A protein has these predicted regions:
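Catalytic binding pocket for nucleotide-activated donors in carbohydrate/polymer assembly enzymes
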Residues: 132, 212, 244-306
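C-terminal amphipathic helix plus adjacent low-complexity
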Residues: 279, 285-351
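Donor nucleotide-activated moiety binding/catalytic core segment of transferases
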Residues: 55-61, 203-250
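A donor-sugar binding/catalytic signature common to diverse glycosyltransferases
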Residues: 73-74, 79-87, 225-268
Length: 351
């Protein structure tokens, strides 16, 4: 007798969630199960015609998923199902004096699906300390599409394309400092530019300044939203600062130039002076052998699994958790203030 389809909920709070959760949706469907999306008000509706959206939290409760997947830092405690953290990037210590936010335990999740050596050991230590969640090293779901060999993007020109994707973190983001430099390089070098911002980089004056530059220069495209793999494949070199997006880009075997990276290393071409960026990009375009070897070593430290089956491992982790651990762990912290704040944010006041 066939089992009924299992239901899962994909919980999106910002636009970056789509590229992270869609590989999961694909695997859920491949197994004959059902996925639905819940979008917070902060997440634009970019769903496709064949994707199911659940519009209210009450409907999400009625959907009764066996698991909910969230790339963000929170998930409503009152929704049914195993709460699964799938992360929105790799651990990057942007500030020297602070532990990476990647490792902050807020008491929302039952499962953390880690990505590789840069995240798993620390989370295993946290699992022993807290006792109310389990850690599974699955690899990052977004990376599945990187290694599936099924994605191709047509290039409209043979000119080198530089992708600029700064972080949003105040005091670290290069977006304010590098506008004049990018404008100068776009005017003087035979390169095309794609400029994208993190959804949280929302300074309207800054956005307008970059948009005006793109409007005036035919070789500059301000795309606002980074479409992940599609955007990466259209470019040859990334210019960045200290964003974890550099790891994603380097996983494709592409070099990155950084401006004042907080943790530079041999896998990056890091510069401290904006005047050196042009030459650094020239060097990156030659793909030096030593640099490319360091890139491979560094990205393997972050993403251990490159077989395109990370989403499958995430679903297997849910099954294992339900079979062996659900109901047998310590209780999560009460989290009363966080829970109240989230209910107020979502305007959900029911018991």
């Amino acid at each position: 007798m066939e089992r009924p389809p299992r239901r899962y909920l994909l919980y999106a709070s910002l636009s970056y969630a789509y590229a992270i959760l869609r590989p999961l949706q694909e695997e859920i469907r491949r197994r004959g199960d059902e996925a639905a999306w819940f979008l917070e008000p902060s997440c634009p509706d970019m769903l496709l015609l064949d994707e199911r959206r659940i519009s209210t939290l009450r409907d999400a409760i009625r959907w009764n998923p066996i698991a909910i997947f969230a790339p963000g830092n929170h998930i409503p405690d009152f929704l049914p199902g195993v709460k699964v953290a799938v992360f929105h990037g790799y651990p990057m210590k942007k500030r020297i004096e602070k532990i990476d936010d990647h490792f902050t335990i807020r008491g929302w999740f039952d499962i953390y699906c880690t990505q590789g050596p840069s995240s798993t050991p620390y989370f295993r230590m946290l699992e022993k300390r807290h006792g109310f969640f389990k850690v599974y090293e699955t690899g990052w779901t977004k990376a599945d599409s990187f290694f599936s060999n099924s994605y191709h993007v047509e290039r409209s020109s043979d000119r080198p394309v530089i992708l600029y994707s700064p972080t949003f973190t105040k005091g670290i983001s290069s977006a304010w400092d590098l506008l004049p430099t990018i404008k100068r390089l776009a005017a003087t070098r035979q390169w095309d530019w794609i400029i994208t911002f993190h959804p949280k980089l929302d300074d309207q004056q800054l956005i307008d300044d970059y948009q005006r530059m793109a409007d005036k220069m035919p070789n500059v495209e301000f795309a606002r939203l980074n479409k992940g793999l599609e955007t990466f494949l259209r470019s040859d070199v990334m210019l960045c600062d200290s964003s974890s997006i550099t790891v994603e880009y380097m996983m494709l075997g592409k070099p990155v130039v950084t401006y004042r990276n907080t943790h530079p290393g041999p896998h990056l071409i890091d510069v401290r002076n904006a005047d050196d960026i042009g030459q650094a990009i020239e060097t990156a375009l030659t793909r030096p052998e030593a640099l490319m070897q360091e890139i491979d070593r560094y990205t393997s430290h972050h993403e251990a699994h490159r077989d395109g089956h990370n989403s499958s491992r995430v679903l297997d982790a849910v099954d294992d958790f339900i079979a062996r651990h659900a109901g047998h762990l310590r209780h999560k912290p009460l989290n009363l203030i966080r829970r109240l704040k989230l209910r107020l944010k979502l305007r959900y006041y029911h018991l």
